[in-house]
Amino acid sequence: MADTPPPLIELIDLERVFDSSEVPVRALDRVSLTIHEGEFVAIIGQSGSGKSTLMSILGCLDRPTGGLYRLGGIDVASLDPVALAGLRRDTFGFVFQRYNLLAGASAAENVEMPAVYAGQPRHQRLERAHALLDRLGMGARSGHFPNQLSGGQQQRVSIARALMNDPRVILADEPTGALDSASGRDVLALLEALHTEGRTVILITHDRDVAARAERVIALQDGRVVEDSGRPAPVGSDRPLGRPPGGAAYLGMAASFGEALKMAGRSLRANIFRTALTLLGVVIGVAAVVTMMAIGEGSKQDVLTRIQSMGTNLLLVRPGAPGIRPSGTDVSLTPTDAEAVAQLAGMAAVAPERMASGITVRREGIDYRTTINGTWPAYAAAKDWPMAWGSFFDATDLQASAPVAVLGQTVAKNLFPGEEDPVGSYFLVRNVPFLVIGVLEAKGATPFGQDQDDIVLIPLTTAFARVSGGRYLSSLTARVEDATTIDESQAAIESLLQARHGKVDFQVRNTQSLLEMVEKTQNSLTLLLGAVALISLLVGGIGVMNIMLVSVTERTREIGIRLATGARASDILLQFNTEAVAVCGVGGLAGVGLGLGAALAVAEFGLPVRFTPGPPIVAFCCAFLTGLLFGYLPARKAARLDPVVALSAE
């Protein structure tokens, strides 16, 4: 005689106590029963009898607080959450009273869900889903959504989903409770057919007529078994628990990010307005980063370009001891110092300067206040400043203290409005007529915002005699022949002047050091702008987290459905994190586009803008990481939901 196989389900003194109120509620009280492979069992009882709680424990949706539950000889209490998810996915198929279909998924997509978590390839899933729907008379409605189906049709879809992974046990909780009598009879006929195929069917109901369709009836009252109609001869099976016959080994969502992305897209499309609001915060944050960095980089390059336009091989000598800001009245530099510097090796051009600011120049009733600068003919070469019209004064003019002048563009336009070329015209400086012999090309502003074109250049000797008086210099500019030797040239000038003066009463700076200093300052300002913009991205990330937390609350039942069909906590974590990352990724791309557009618009108003690939890439990566970080907390909350609690959510 063959050995009797062990029961598929064995309960010994099973208890379930809920401590949610002041008085503990004992939903199940020392329930003991066995169910063998292939049985059709109806568990009947009135509301509050504990039948639904028993079904949740049988289907591994809930855990007992006492007693023993063996499934195929295995103590279920010894299984970890991943193993329990495997049982829900492969061993049990759930048919719920309220159908529990995902509203945003079609009939076929609802049916294939357990196979998604089983790691089956998409074409196999769809093929089996359509085959099951055809078998249940729903083939023509495989693309319909739940709200387009009747109650009976939705329950058929639910049964097809339960069969997707070819489970050993069908758990049907009040499957006819929400159906009309005709649809109810059809559903019961389907359950009977599944039993005939050899599956174990456990039917939960409060209706005696429905229970009569089963081969065995177990009645519960106040959490206890009060009736058991008997036990048919066991059938037995050598099918292992936890994997559908012929199915793929469980790969999990972690190995199928594409599936998680598809689910995320479906969920996000289900509430376009909320998704758009979530996107908006990220878009604005990324756009702010891209725009501000483009403006900051543009401003930096504008300033650096202005310094470079002066030349990176210039040495600027000013009177006054180092560490003390020049006052403009220091008299430590003289023309003879300039002559001595010009004799040093490696000097391409040397130009002493005697400035007088706020001088009024006049022409035919037009008064204009400007700066008059007395200098040498080498000034144009030292400053690398070409002529627009006319010529620069020469050594003869310098020797004769000639009343001749070269105008900057700003002075020329204000003193000679409407005249393209004022060369040959006269204007007055302190009632002394000066002849315009040339006009410089436009130079623009200095790095510090001073208009370089607002200047009148005259011979140094003329400035001493007719404008400023005295014989001292405001500054001295020296251009070296080779920029690589600028440090050596600076040291030579410092040694020369210290030897001539007997002390260090001057300051020497080179434009290269100035360039480096300004570049550091501008980099700091650019980073500051970027940091301010990143704050808006941070705010957008907090918005993503808030919306995702709301989404988890609203979709608690969906999470319960996914857990009931075999999703692991890691699958739920991946899905909701993927949704957050998808939102931030799309928002990041849109933000980069908006930021580039905004920067171009700003450039139309004259602000300097410079695009580099770095800021958009960094901004997008920050948006992506924002989704990852701020989406984790809501995703973790979703992943930690209890299946039975999630399923009971409204």
Swiss-Prot record:
EC number: 7.6.2.-
Binding site for ATP: 45-52
GO cellular component, one term: plasma membrane
Entry's localization field: Cell inner membrane
GO MF annotation: an example: transmembrane transporter activity
Family matches, as PROSITE patterns: ABC_TRANSPORTER_1, ABC_TRANSPORTER_2, MACB
Subunit structure: Homodimer.
Job description of the protein: Non-canonical ABC transporter that contains transmembrane domains (TMD), which form a pore in the inner membrane, and an ATP-binding domain (NBD), which is responsible for energy generation. Confers resistance against macrolides.
Listed name of the protein: Macrolide export ATP-binding/permease protein MacB
